[in-house]
Amino acid sequence: RTALAQTAGAADGLAATMRAAAMDVIERRYTDVEFDAVQLAAELHVSRRQLNRYFSGAPRTVQQAILTRRLAAVRGMILTVPHRDLESIARECGFADGGAMRSRFLRSFGIGPAAFRRAAAAAVPVPDAMLLTAEQTARGRPSPAATIAE
C-alpha cells in the first residue's frame, strides 16, 4: 500500500473510533437538556469542527445523532409508561419542553407523540420509521412493535 492509502485508512479508523466514543457519550448524556455538540466535543477533547469531520462519513450529523437518541427515548417512554404526561417525558429525554419535543417528533416521524401514544394504545400498526433499528434491539432495547402487539 502507498503511504497515502495507509494514512487514509488510519484516518478512517480514527473517525470510526471517535464516532463510537461520541455515541457512548451521547448515550450517557442525552437526558441533559444542556447537552449539545459543543459539550460533546469538549468531553471528547476535540474542537467542534474536528468532531463534525469525524461524523462527515456517517449517516447523521452530530446534532442529528443526539436528537435521534432523544427521540428513541421518547418513543420508548411513550410505549412503556403510557400514562406519563408528555411534558415530563420531554424533560426526562433531554428536551427543554414539550413543545420542542412535539415539533421534533412530528418532523421526524410524521406523527405527533400524542397520536403515536393513541396508536400504540389501540394497537394500530405503527410505521416502520418509528420502530427501533436492529442495532438498538441488539443492544437489549425491546422493539416497540413487540410492545404494541402485546
What does each model-identified segment do?
Residues I111, P127, P144-E150:
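Extended, charge-rich intrinsically disordered regulatory tails
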Residues R1-A8:
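An amphipathic alpha-helical interaction segment
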